Regions:
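Short, solvent-exposed amphipathic alpha-helical segments in soluble enzyme
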Residues: 59-61, 93-94, 139-142
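Flexible, acidic/His-enriched mid-domain "rim/lid" segments that flank
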Residues: 1-13, 23-28, 104-160
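Short internal beta-strands
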Residues: 66-80, 124-126
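Glycine-rich nucleotide phosphate-binding loop and flanking beta-alpha elements
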Residues: 50-52, 84, 131
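Terminal domain-start leader segments
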Residues: 1-72
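Short amphipathic alpha-helical segments
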Residues: 56-58, 89-90, 135-138
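Conserved residues at the C-terminal ends of beta-strands
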Residues: 46, 99, 126
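Compact, glycine/acidic-enriched structural inserts
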Residues: 78-108
Length: 160
């Protein structure tokens, strides 16, 4: 039996989120304007606070990586199989669940979001949160892309 590297699962009803969909969309629009100014094709969020701020989902990692991928048109959370469809129910966006059957399925889930014909040239990451190991793996997968620290800009966007 072939086990999947990642999959989607939408079961149950969407939960009431802390903020309205309009609020999350306003936050995303502000972030996308930064992406446009800084020529970023994609952002990989990894911190609990930024994933929650932009998607509504608050994770508990249990030693597994979590992420939220933001492009010009998409926002997708990447979560571990242990959470099943909870991240989809507790966010205003799509979700991809990665499995633990093989190493680095988290990264495979990230690359599944990208159009194969449009590899991102510039990717924003959170240098104040991402581990050195994950940073190296992202650099290997996106070897033709430049990684840019956007952690300070993200923090400013969260300020009222």
């Amino acid at each position: 039996m072939e086990r999947p590297d990642f999959f989607t699962l939408k079961n149950g009803e969407k939960a009431k989120l802390p903020f309205s969909n309009e609020e999350y969309n306003q936050r995303l629009n502000k972030l996308r304007s930064i992406m446009d100014k800084d020529n970023l094709d994609m952002i990989i969020l990894t911190s609990m606070h930024n994933i929650a701020y932009y998607s509504g989902f608050i994770y508990c990692s249990f030693g597994r990586p979590y992420g939220c991928i933001i492009t010009e048109k998409k926002i997708v959370t990447i979560s571990a199989n242990i959470d099943a469809s909870q991240p989809w129910r507790r966010s205003h966006c799509e979700n991809i669940i990665y499995t633990d059957w093989k190493k680095d399925n988290f990264l495979k889930a990230i690359t599944s979001i990208i159009d194969e014909n449009k590899i991102p040239k510039n990717i924003g990451i959170e240098n104040d949160h991402i581990t050195l190991e994950m940073n190296e793996k992202i650099q290997l997968i996106f070897s033709a892309s430049a990684l840019t620290d956007i952690s300070k800009k993200l923090m400013k966007l969260r300020m009222i």
